[in-house]
């Protein structure tokens, strides 16, 4: 096995890790099993709608307190309680961790601890070496100086502080919620014969399954390629509204986060060729004003913000993509960007999540979300309760689409974060910054395209 494959396997597995174990990287994502016969409820189109482009960017493995716990005016925390009930200051998180923290469904339950929110330090991978000392990095956070550009976006535009992950587990279900507003009770990543591929969906080899945990306690396993629930792509195609999913190529690092790979009527038909584009095309499409009405932008794994990668490098990549929109006045003046992350990643958050329709797996901790648009309320912290389906509810309402019939049906539409009558905010073109250098080689040499 060559060095490149070894490195990617470290970035691919989501197993439990201890200090003495080999360096590994979890890129968790859960697969949604379909919801049958979703009811279509017509949404009223937004009058005088200035939004012509909606961009959904989903990065990896963070909580609100991890990135914005010190943000002024937000519901953040700078301390945590340990399992003995003692209060401690949250540790300062380094730019790059040594390995991943466990964050599957069982890890959520451990961290949640029946609502006491004191079990994060018990997670495998929580204790890691930082500057020669073992530090509880699960109970840690970044400061403004560590992620200055993410903070500039949050300070300039709108920062919701009660935006919850739908599923108490890893990436896959939440990515599916970002395209379909449902997950049919899936609570884990696809596993089995896909341990040597970067796929979670219809491209998985036979024998791959994903777990579903139903509200009655029953657990089932299915192949992660679904045909009996609608995605937002289906709704858009039915109305001849343009859309694309931009991601790394098939079997490249990060491709598994392209949730449309799990939608059979898109992945296994001509729709895939029509609506799939390599992530490298996003910048040129923005520059040429050829972005579709709705875009999902999936990053390569090395700039995903997922441990073990550098958050500085991930922030720089994000700035590049958003700059491309802001540097084209016509595109910027008609765009709403939703920049969020996909699961809690094992990191602390202090807010007890609400219960969802399937209380066995819904909802999880708060996700960071920044709403970036000329029509986002400026310098605004939005305390409204949202979740991933709210981004789709916004899309439905802006475009006059029917409901997908999942959690979007009763979700808040995020209009509280916007003022479509305000003077459009100017673009905020940011500079990339110089990132720390690391001794272990290989990440920069992998073909992530």
Q: For each predicted feature, which ranges?
A:
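Bacterial N-terminal signal peptides
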Residues: 19-33
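N-terminal pro-sequences and low-complexity stem/linker regions of secreted or lumenal proteins
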Residues: 37-449
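N-terminal secretory signal peptides that target proteins for export/translocation
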Residues: 1-13
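Structural motif marking the loop-to-transmembrane transition
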Residues: 12-16, 47
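Generic short N-terminal amphipathic or hydrophobic helices
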Residues: 16-18, 40
């Amino acid at each position: 096995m060559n060095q490149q494959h070894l490195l990617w396997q470290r970035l691919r597995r989501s197993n439990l890790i201890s200090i003495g174990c080999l360096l590994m990287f979890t890129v968790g994502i859960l697969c949604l099993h379909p919801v049958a016969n979703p009811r279509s409820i017509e949404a009223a189109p937004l009058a005088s709608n200035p939004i012509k482009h909606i961009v959904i960017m989903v990065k990896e493995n963070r909580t609100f307190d991890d990135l914005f716990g010190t943000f002024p005016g937000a519901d953040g925390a700078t301390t945590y309680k340990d399992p003995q009930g003692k209060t401690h200051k949250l540790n300062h998180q380094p730019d790059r961790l040594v390995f991943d923290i466990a964050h599957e469904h069982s890890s959520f339950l451990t961290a949640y601890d029946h609502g006491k929110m004191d079990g994060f330090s018990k997670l495998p991978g929580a204790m890691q070496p930082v500057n020669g000392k073992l530090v509880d990095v699960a109970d840690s956070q970044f400061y403004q100086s560590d992620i200055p550009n993410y903070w500039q976006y949050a300070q300039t535009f709108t920062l919701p502080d009660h935006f919850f992950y739908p599923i108490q587990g890893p990436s896959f279900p939440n990515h599916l919620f970002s395209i379909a507003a449902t997950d049919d009770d899936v609570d884990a990543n696809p596993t089995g014969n896909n341990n040597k591929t970067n796929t979670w969906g219809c491209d998985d080899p036979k024998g791959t399954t994903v777990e579903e945990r139903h509200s009655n306690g029953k657990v089932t396993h299915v192949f992660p390629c679904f045909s009996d629930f609608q995605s937002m792509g289906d709704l858009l195609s039915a109305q001849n509204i343009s859309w694309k999913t931009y991601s790394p190529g098939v079997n490249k690092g990060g491709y598994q986060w392209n949730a449309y790979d799990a939608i059979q009527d898109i992945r296994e038909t001509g729709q895939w060729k029509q609506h799939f584009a390599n992530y490298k095309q996003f910048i040129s499409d923005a520059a040429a004003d050829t972005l579709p009405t709705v875009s999902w932008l999936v990053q390569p794994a090395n700039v995903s913000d997922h441990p073990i990668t550098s958050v500085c490098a991930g922030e720089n990549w994000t700035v590049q993509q958003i700059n491309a929109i802001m540097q084209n006045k016509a595109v910027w003046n008609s765009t709403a960007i939703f920049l969020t992350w996909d699961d809690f990643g094992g990191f602390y958050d202090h807010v007890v999540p609400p219960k969802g329709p399937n209380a066995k797996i819904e909802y999880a901790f708060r996700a960071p979300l920044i709403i970036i648009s000329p029509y986002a309320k400026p310098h605004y912290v939005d305390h409204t309760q949202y979740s991933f389906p709210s981004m789709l509810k916004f899309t439905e309402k802006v475009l006059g689409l029917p409901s997908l019939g999942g959690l979007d049906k009763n979700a808040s539409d995020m209009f509280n974060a916007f003022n479509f009558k305000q003077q459009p905010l100017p673009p905020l073109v940011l500079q990339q910054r110089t990132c720390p250098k690391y001794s272990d080689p290989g990440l920069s040499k992998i073909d992530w395209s």
